[in-house]
């Protein structure tokens, strides 16, 4: 499994102060641009992409509807994504499928989409249908993050991931059950067929994230012969 570390600067000064030495061995950087006001995103972008030019980068606008910090119309959401893609060619672009499904057809020319679904309230009863709908679209990555209310919710997320990966071996999945209760799903990513796990530098970008330092240690143990 690859380790993804989110960075969440709230202004250009914080972007410039990001310490590369702390994340040098990280596989992928996720830029959570929703920590900025809309008009600052393109201003901060050059600092981010220059600083992380040696890493794979995910561009993410996590909206309030899915646990983030920004509210955007369909038009603004698409415009920002297209501007960033044209100027900086991020390796991956997160697209909130269920929040912006009506405009997905305008993204069909993007081959690097992460079609994502985030539910910070529950693990929905129709989780299998969520997996099916996203898988049928065959994006670069299917990402699903849900909140468990009990142990069975965690096991359901893990079992569905394993099952869909077995049936669709060429599709990349990134899944997690959030909070402390769901933390095992982050550690068992390889086992269940999830390609990435997310780790935090300091501030969590989602409940239950493990620190990068701890995740490196755990990964060493899991990868040891």
From Swiss-Prot:
Coiled coil: none annotated. Keywords: Amino-acid biosynthesis, Aromatic amino acid biosynthesis, Lyase, Schiff base. GO terms for biological process: 3,4-dihydroxybenzoate biosynthetic process; amino acid biosynthetic process; aromatic amino acid family biosynthetic process; chorismate biosynthetic process. 3-dehydroquinate binds at residues 30-32, 62, 186, 205, 209. One of its GO terms (molecular function) is 3-dehydroquinate dehydratase activity. Pfam families: DHquinase_I (PF01487). Pathway: Metabolic intermediate biosynthesis; chorismate biosynthesis; chorismate from D-erythrose 4-phosphate and phosphoenolpyruvate: step 3/7. It catalyses: 3-dehydroquinate = 3-dehydroshikimate + H2O. InterPro entries: Aldolase_TIM, DHquinase_I, Type-I_3-dehydroquinase. Belongs to the type-I 3-dehydroquinase family. CDD domains: DHQase_I. It comes from the Bacteria. It is an enzyme of class 4 (lyase). The active site is at residues 118, 143. This is 3-dehydroquinate dehydratase. Homodimer. Involved in the third step of the chorismate pathway, which leads to the biosynthesis of aromatic amino acids. Catalyzes the cis-dehydration of 3-dehydroquinate (DHQ) and introduces the first double bond of the aromatic ring to yield 3-dehydroshikimate. Its EC number is 4.2.1.10.
């Amino acid at each position: 499994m690859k380790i993804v570390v989110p960075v969440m600067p709230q202004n250009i000064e914080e972007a410039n102060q990001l310490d590369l030495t702390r994340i040098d061995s990280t596989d992928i950087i996720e830029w959570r641009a929703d920590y900025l006001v809309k008009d600052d995103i393109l201003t901060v972008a050059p600092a981010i992409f220059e600083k992380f030019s040696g890493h794979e980068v995910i561009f993410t606008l996590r909206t309030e509807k899915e646990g983030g910090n920004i509210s955007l119309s369909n038009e603004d959401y698409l415009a920002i994504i297209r501007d960033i893609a044209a100027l900086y060619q991020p390796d991956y672009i997160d697209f909130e499928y269920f929040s912006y499904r009506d405009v997905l057809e305008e993204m069909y020319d993007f081959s690097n989409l992460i079609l994502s679904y985030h539910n910070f309230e529950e693990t929905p009863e129709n989780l299998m249908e969520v997996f099916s709908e996203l898988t049928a679209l065959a994006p670069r990555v299917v990402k699903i993050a849900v909140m468990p209310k009990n142990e069975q919710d965690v096991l359901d997320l893990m079992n569905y991931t394993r099952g869909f990966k077995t049936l669709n071996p060429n599709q990349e999945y990134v899944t997690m059950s959030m909070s402390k209760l769901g933390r095992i799903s982050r550690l068992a990513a390889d086992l269940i067929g999830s390609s990435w796990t997310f780790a935090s530098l300091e501030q969590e970008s989602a409940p239950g994230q493990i620190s990068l330092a701890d995740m490196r240690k755990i990964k060493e143990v899991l990868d040891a012969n």
